[in-house]
Amino acid sequence: MHRTIFILSLLFLILPAKAQPKHEVRAAWITAVYGLDWPRTRATTPQGIRKQKEELVDILDKLRAANFNTVLFQTRTRGDVLYPSSIEPFNSILTGKVGGNPGYDPLAFAVEECHKRGMECHAWMVTIPLG
């Protein structure tokens, strides 16, 4: 009987050591409202597209260096979006005019760049704008 209790006690001590570690989410929002976080440059020329992408890469590099593992990337604001859509136009922050095609898919680019850094990328959509 004592041997069974001893073995069970050891088993209960060993099992938690084999359990998966908790996944800690260290996230940051990247907002496109008024270009507060991103972008600062308009994508109206090939140089503008390159600069806009570099700005996002720089933000992601800083987040990775600060040990973040998740990005909440704003993809929709007030009826406009940061990805190609047949329903809503591109956000004016990308090119300076509503519906202006920036020449690339900002959401796909953000996802790709996050994954290169081992980070998750979640689409953040404003559904109830206030103010």
List where the protein language model places each region:
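Hydrophobic h-region of N-terminal signal peptides that target proteins for export
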Residues: 9-18
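Aromatic-lined carbohydrate-binding/catalytic grooves of carbohydrate-active enzymes
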Residues: 66-102
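Boundary/entry segment of secreted carbohydrate-active catalytic domains
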Residues: 20-49
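Aromatic- and glycine-enriched glycan-recognition loops and surfaces
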Residues: 45-66, 93-117
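Positively charged n-region of N-terminal signal peptides that target proteins for export
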Residues: 1-4
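Extracytoplasmic/secreted cell-surface and envelope-processing proteins
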Residues: 37-39, 80-84, 130-131
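Glycine-rich, aromatic-flanked loop segments that form ligand/cofactor-binding clefts
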Residues: 22-28, 64, 68-78, 106-131
